[in-house]
Each structure stands twice: as C-alpha cells, then as structure tokens.
Amino acid sequence: MKITVIGAGNVGATTAFRIADKKLARELVLLDVVEGIPQGKGLDMYETGPVGLFDTKITGSNDYADTADSDIVIITAGLPRKPGMTREDLLMKNAGIVKEVTDNIMKHSKNPIIIVVSNPLDIMTHVAWVRSGLPKERVIGMAGVLDAARFRSFIAMELGVSMQDINACVLGGHGDAMVPVVKYTTVAGIPISDLLPAETIDKLVERTRNGGAEIVEHLKQGSAFYAPASSVVEMVESIVLDRKRVLPCAVGLEGQYGIDKTFVGVPVKLGRNGVEQIYEINLDQADLDLLQKSAKIVDENCKMLESTIG
C-alpha cells in the first residue's frame, strides 16, 4: 500500500506520522512545494522507525513523480483565511491549489482514492472530484469524523464518562453548517436526551459547531491539527484494512436526502474500494432542513467556481 500526503504543514505531517506509526503503508510520500520541509520531516519520521517498530519507507519530496502509483492520496494543501480576505477570495485561491494538486496527482496515479482535508472542505472535495475524473466513491472529504469526535469529547467532558462509550452523528457541511443529530447520539446506548437537559445539549452542539474556531482562538496563530489528522487516519485505516467502518464523510450524493450532485457529510461505509455504501437515515424535519440548507450553500459556492475548476 502506497499512501501520499500532499502538504507538509501541521495537519499533513501529523497525518503522515500517524499513518507510519500505525503501520498502514508500505510506502509513504510527504509532498510539499517548499523545498526542505517534507524532506526534513520525512527523515525525522523515518528515524522513529526503530523506536516505533515500523519499516515504512518514507520519502519527503517536492516532485509529484515520487507519488506515482499511489493507492491513497490525502490532500491537506491550502491557505488559511487571512485578515481582510473575503470568503470568496479564500475559495478561489484554495480551489486553484486543489485543482493544481489534483491534476498533478492524476498524472502519476491512475485510480487512487483521494481524501480531501483542505478547506472549505465540501467544496474542495467537489473540486478534486471534478478535476480527477474519478468515480464519486473514490473522492471523499474528511468532515463529520472530526466534528463527531469533537461532539463526543465535549459530551464526555460534561458527563465525566469515557469517550469510548459515546457515539455521535454529525452530518452536513464542515463548519457552521454542520448538523449534529441529537437523536442518534448515545452514551453506552442511552440517548443523550435522557442524560442531559436540552439547554446543555444545545450548548454542546454550539460548541461543536465552533470547535475549530475555539482552538484558533487559543493558539492565536495556526489551527487544529492533532484531531483533524487523527480523523483522517481513522478513515485511512478503514480503507486500508477493509474495516467497513460506518463514518460520516463528505461524499457526492445522487438524490439521497433530497440532495443531488453535491458533496456533503453523511454516514457511509468505508472499505477497500472507498465509499461502498451511503446510508440514508431517518431525520427529523428540522435536521433534514438543516442538511439541505448546508448542501445548498455548498452547491452555490461550487457553481461560483465553475469557470475556475473547468
């Protein structure tokens, strides 16, 4: 199994290291446009092999030729939003980056599974799908896995219980448009509504929506990377080991939930072939309305990018 991570920043490098440490790849490529960064980080990771007991071949590179014949490619490359930059500016710049990255990936790998982490995530996943020409089941956005992890951690914090006993369902867009589905959120099989008052649940939902911004506020510079990287690796593990995990991911819908030709976060089965099944679960009307609203925002932004992404 050969896995490539595009972007050697905090998210990309942490993702690459966790993949190596969990022995999920025979060969791992960390690629970045900045010379020296992927080479140095890649070598540093490789030198942990004797301690971590893994033999993964790790290559840091600035040359897409080194990514040839990758089975999985993870795109983390992109710019953060800067002061004075409009959302439209960010969309255009990152769409251009993801377009170029995807074009270069496809020059060297015929049929990879592409996992997109770059923001705005659902829209960038659409860009990668359009440019790659791959079937929708092979282009996946990391969305709800991270959001559900945050929701679960906040619930555990509130109740003082193990995170392992908490299951949460978060659908929709990654960010303000996410839809934490309370009725499918449980603690050891017990509905969360039986354990916490509605106003507390509402506060936890809102904190989940602002989870990324909360970390940015603490850090002052930079954004979250441990939890995003761990979420990507959970997806990679399910694909590589054919685990058939049911995880919330941004995928291209074709009529499910009344949404068509739009990438949005829903529960899917992830296995060796990528997205092997999309689950259309029963939602309350309020949650369905929020999910469709989230998809509409993604669709509008994608239409704005049509001339950019070809």
Curated annotation (Swiss-Prot):
Protein keywords: NAD, Oxidoreductase, Tricarboxylic acid cycle
EC number: 1.1.1.37
SUPFAM superfamilies: LDH C-terminal domain-like, NAD(P)-binding Rossmann-fold domains
Cleaved signal peptide residues: none
InterPro entries for this protein: L-lactate/malate_DH, Lactate/malate_DH_C, Lactate/malate_DH_N, Lactate_DH/Glyco_Ohase_4_C, Malate_DH_type3, NAD(P)-bd_dom_sf
Protein's name in the database: Malate dehydrogenase
Subunit structure comment from the entry: Homotetramer; arranged as a dimer of dimers.
Any Pfam family hit: Ldh_1_N
Binding residue positions for substrate: 81, 87, 119, 150
CDD domains: LDH-like_MDH
GO annotation, biological process: lactate metabolic process; tricarboxylic acid cycle
NCBIfam families: MalateDH_bact, PRK06223.1
Family affiliation: Belongs to the LDH/MDH superfamily. MDH type 3 family.
The encoding gene: mdh
Paired cysteines (S-S): none
Reactions performed catalytically: (S)-malate + NAD(+) = oxaloacetate + NADH + H(+)
